[in-house]
Structure formats: structure tokens, C-alpha cells
Amino acid sequence: MKTWKKIMAAAGAAGLALGLAACGGGDSAADANKLIVGASPTPHAQILRYVADNLAKKQGIELEIKEYTDYNQPNQALNSGDLDANYYQTVPYFDEKTAKNNWQFDHGKGIHLEPVGIYSEKLKDIKDLKDGAKIGVITEETNQKRGLQLLADNGLIKLPKDENQQLVAVIAKSKEYNPRGFDLSEVEGPQLVRSLADLDIAVINGNFALDGGKKPSDALVLESPKDNPSLNILVWKKDSKKLEAIKKLDALLHSPEVKAFIEKKWPNKAVLPGF
């Protein structure tokens, strides 16, 4: 009798262990399809919410979206494991930061473009800009180069051949690069729109312009989308254990539905599909 009880107890324990293993396996499968994605509020988080509400469940993906308002935290959070992916940066920014920090990241193809523009609350035409005018540019280096390029493309400044230096400081002090004596100021991206009251013009990234209530038609000048390298991308760790779910998300972000959503959401072309 005792032997029989021992056998039954052992069988029960084995059954319990199998049950717990099965439950654990189910949780693991669910976790593998839950993605925490960091994003800028506009337009990245808006695009991700559309995917979460309309497309993700059909692919068995659950999205949790964390919003960030600066350019440093999303990559740091991805590297530390707090995020499974992020969606906020351009290809040139990705290339520069991953090389500088030795991050083992990967990315998909370009999803969308937010055209950088020159904005003003004092001028109606860029031709009216006077010598010595105050110009605001973003502090973050990669996007700063993009903004300075737009100023150069419009004949306002010249760019040094050696870009591995403090460009704003070099240009501001140089008669060669800044013959009209413009007063260049570096401003944090989210503050650029509100700083327009103290500036003659500012070069503002599309997402910060949108956050500040500006639209492309308000810009004195917009960069051209043709052959533009500054498309925004989904980024993840190369050794992520959730690669299958991440690749599904990246495919959804390149779907006809997302392209149609972008075109409908931003008919003023503040955001352009990149595919």
C-alpha cells in the first residue's frame, strides 16, 4: 500500500512539473511576441499605435510603446535591454552612434522621412534674411550636419571639408564659411520651435516642427526627399531573442496599410513614406 502511495505521489509530482513546464512554455511564447518599442512621440509613436491597433494582433504581436523626447535615451535603453527595438532615428544617425559606442545593433529599411525645414516667425521669404541674423540649429551632431547642409544648399553658409570638428563654432567664427556674419546658436531639438521668438530663423527637424505645431507649408525652405539618406528606421539588437517578432513588426511598418496611413494622416507632407 505504501509503495502504491509512493508511486501515485511521484506521478502527481511529475504531472505537476509537466503542468508548470507547459505553463512556463506558454508564458515564454507570449513574451517572445511582446515587443517594447521606444519611439519619438511624433510621428513614430503615432505610426506604431496604428500598427498596434490595426495590424499587430493579426501577426500575433503585442506592442508596448514607450515615448522619448530626446535622441540619447532610446539607444541606451535598447542597449541595456529595457527596449526590444526603437523607432526614432535616421540611417546616418544610426551609423554614427553605433560606430562611436560599439553597439551591436541592426536595422531595417527606411520607413519614412520627416523633411527638415527652415522656419521663421519674423520672415516670409528666406531672401529677406539680413546679414548678422540669428540662426538656431539643433545641438545633436548628426541632425545638426543635416541642418547645416540645408543652410549651405541655400547659399547662407559654406561647410568645412573636415566635418570632424565643432562645426557651429568653426563656421560662426569664419569669414570663409560664414561671410554674412550670422549668429549661430545651438538649441535642443524640442526647444527649437519655441525659440523662434528669439531667432530670425531656425532649422528644425520634421518631428520637432510637428510637435511644436508647425507644418511644412510654414517653412521658408524644405529639404528635398529625392535621394535623401535621412529615412527613419526600426532598430534592434543583433542578438535579440525576439528577432522573429521584430522582423514581423518591421514588415508591418513597410506594409501598404502603413503607407496609406502616413499619406492620410499627414496630407500636408510633413511625413512622407520612404517605401
State where each predicted segment sits:
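Bacterial signal peptide processing site
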Residues: 24-26
